Amino acid sequence: IRDSLVGSEMCIRDSNMTNTVGKKWIEQNKPGNILSITTTWVWTGSPFVVPSAMSKSGINAMTKSLAVEWGPHNIRLNCIAPGPFPTEGAWSRLSPETEDNKGALDQSSMSSNPMGRVGEMNELGNLATFLMADGCDYLTGQTIAIDGAAYLSAGGTFASLGKLKDEDWTNIRDTIKKSNEKDKNLRNTK
């Protein structure tokens, strides 16, 4: 339940920020461009990520709805739905490595992807730049997947996790908690 509430809070926070900025632009008669990050789970669903899928689906619906509502004010809204892009934060939580499974998420992501690889951060940045560019003024209300066609070919990203045993889940949970604590300690300034 706590995770579902956190997902809902993230959606509400993002929606409040978007509404605040959008209303200000409308009052000042200024054009604007809002770019959100969602996930392909907004289309496919996926096991084991219900809180994330719920909150990201809310962002996806908000993007489509406000694109229509705010379009007459020259305010554009779009989303990017990235597939597997290896970052330390994501990888340490999605596939906590142990000595037994080093590189398992990379291998799994690459083998199930039609392009046979994971995304590179510059590719994600290039898409964001394109969507924010002045030359892209007519594109609004869209969610663009950048995942090498993975969601089209594989559907639910984490379906294979259904094969894990209780002991595996305990180990994963402990590793994720350690990763979260490490990140939290890095953010704390004393």
Regions found by a protein language model. Give the residues of each.
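A glycine/serine/threonine-rich, flexible loop-to-helix segment
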Residues: 72, 84-112, 154-183
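Active-site loop-to-helix junction immediately N-terminal to the catalytic Tyr of the SDR YXXXK motif
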Residues: 45-53, 65, 93
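C-terminal helical subdomain
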Residues: 79, 101-139, 146-148, 173-190
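Active-site loop of short-chain dehydrogenase/reductase
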Residues: 14, 25-39, 72-75, 142
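Active-site helix of classical SDR
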Residues: 18, 55, 63
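Alpha-helical segment proximal to the catalytic Tyr-Lys
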Residues: 23, 68-72, 137
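Active-site loop immediately N-terminal to the catalytic Tyr-X3-Lys motif
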Residues: 44-50, 72, 116, 121, ...
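Single conserved hydrophobic/aromatic residue that forms the stacking wall/gate
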Residues: 1-7, 12
